[in-house]
Amino acid sequence: QNPSAYLTLEDDKLLYFGQKVDGVIPYGVVGSTIVINGDPICADSDFPVLLAEFKEFCQRSAHNLFFISVTDHFLEEYKKQGFGWVKNGEEARFHLADYEISGKKGAKMRMNINHARKAGVVVHEYCPLKQRDAQIEADLNRITNEWLQQKKSSMLTFVMGTVGLENPMDKRYFYATDADGKIVAFIVFVPFLGKRGYMADVTRHGTGAPSGVMETILYDAFQVFKNEGIEYGSLGVAPLAGLKNDSSNPVEKLLCFAYNHLNDCYGFRDLYRAKEKYSPTEWVPSYYIYLPKIPTPDMFYALVTIQNPHQIREAAEDLVKGCAQRLRNKRTSPTHQSKPSRQVSWTASSSTKQPDTRKQTDADKKAD
């Protein structure tokens, strides 16, 4: 039921297998914290036993626990066993039978797709388990390299999968070609809900990809899934989206502050907007679950580090650059020149970057 479940098969996870019941829990270790991606994988009836067993396993080795990307499916049992919890974002999900882009809500999506179609974009599915194509795979690798150069930051791990062409298993690959037949972008989907749903896990575009290409790939892939009888599509979780600014939970207050003020470090707002433009049919809440009930700073450090060991350094550099740019803008603005200088106040509005709609964005999630 959790779209993150398939990522258990990636090589960056350690696996805990149940001793008393059948089940598996994917995790990683940073210092004294064990980080778990998604819910434990087991039958619903076995979940209480598996969770208690894993909790004891971690406590015996004096490790704290931090679950990420957890659904509300087992939320009450986590609470019952003494875990703390807080909403950490919302998953953009699509009920494919109801998904459409007509009307005002889908206007931007239609515009982007029409732009791509006019530019000659055509979407194809690549099925490596049926027949490998060395040229297609070389092009997908080229796009990954171009995408990384555009990002100028490290790639996320643990919460995201890999392209995985060496062992595709149940992954689905959709790519787009331009008017010249050149591959310019691709999306890798992973299954969830027993293949009743597919999540866009890896989303990448190359240099010079036409505007609207990612929207076109996603829409066409969803149409293929819909025709196959698949029920759901997903773009994964938009981190820190949908939190309450007036929450009494101190952890949620901290996360709200990050969402409102630290977009120089991580584009929380931009990522939410990138998913929102696809017009999801529902936003599914996602949670952090942790023990002890009040998470310590080193637990949050583990959360960041396990996804990208370089992210803290890169975030600090981005924050400094963002602050410096705003300071330069303030000094050169007519308002600033006509009035006495004042102390700069970094407000939520001034620290929020506005997305460039002419450029392609990574629908994932995840800005990895």
Placement of each model-derived feature along the sequence:
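Intrinsic disorder/low-complexity segments enriched in small, polar and charged residues
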Residues: S338-S341
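Glycine-rich phosphate-binding "P-loop"
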Residues: V35-S45
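Active-site rim elements
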Residues: A258-D264
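Asp/Glu-rich intrinsically disordered low-complexity tracts
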Residues: D356-R358, D362, D368
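A conserved beta-strand-loop-helix scaffold within acyl/acetyltransferase catalytic domains
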Residues: Q1-V35, H63, F67-G84, Y99-N112, ...
